[in-house]
Amino acid sequence: MCIRDRDGCMDMIELKKTVDKCSIEGKRIFAIVATLGTTVRGAIDPIDNISKFCNERNIWLHIDGSIGGIFSITNLSINRINNVHFANSITINPQKILGITKTSSLLIVSNTEILKNTFSTGLPYVSNENNFFNRGELGIQGSRPAEIIKLWLGLRFLGMRGIEDVLNSSIKRRIFFENNLDTYKYDLYSGPLHIISFLPKGMNKNESDSWTLNKRINLLKKNFMISRPLFKNRYYLRAVFGNYNTSESNINDLLKLLN
């Protein structure tokens, strides 16, 4: 674990300290995991700087793009989103925002030969003629159902214009909510994506934990699904604006209940 800065991103100074400490203690680090869209606020780590550090130390760079990775396939102007090509591997979950039926999760690697050398054992019942390679040996699972078909169909249905519309509108909904939530009443924690968390000002831990619990219950009764993540030993309320069908009037109704 690495300490994060005030914007919720990985702190490079703390990262270097942590890696150096592990080296002194004889602990071997085989990978550093950067996050493209943190769970609580949708923050994006400084992937380019982390990549340079990983190259210097010969450490594998993996990006957890479960939340924000899908944004990287678009031309949307989002800071740090276009640095995914620096990674050795990345996970992307199209099910989280594009509406692809579960489960739809991808592991993309820059060099598939590494997966082949790691997992392939050779199968006596599969022919090796004509340099044929069984792609089922690229992971721990020997076989998978045709889950890729629903992703392919979903992407074909949306097209690049549709994908960008879905993703861009999610950011606009978060911005609208953030701009209209009472900042005199709440502390806000967000990033460049579609996620925002908030907490009332001036409350101690017990007070805010009780408030978030009761407020979430009351909002659920009004058909608003707001999550309550634990972050830095306190509970927050978190709004995720990935649903394409969420209208401005829906958000205004939520704001009335909060403001």
What is each model feature region?
Residues 187-218:
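Conserved PLP-binding catalytic core of the aspartate aminotransferase-like
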Residues 82-181, 192:
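Active-site C-terminal subdomain of aminotransferase-like
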Residues 191, 195, 221-238:
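Conserved PLP cofactor-binding pocket of PLP-dependent enzymes
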Residues 231-259:
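PLP-dependent enzyme catalytic core of the Aspartate aminotransferase-like
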Residues 51, 55, 182, 218-220:
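Anion (oxyanion) recognition and catalysis
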Residues 4-114:
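Conserved PLP-enzyme active-site core in the AAT-like
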Residues 210-220, 252-259:
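Short amphipathic alpha-helices in soluble, non-transmembrane regions
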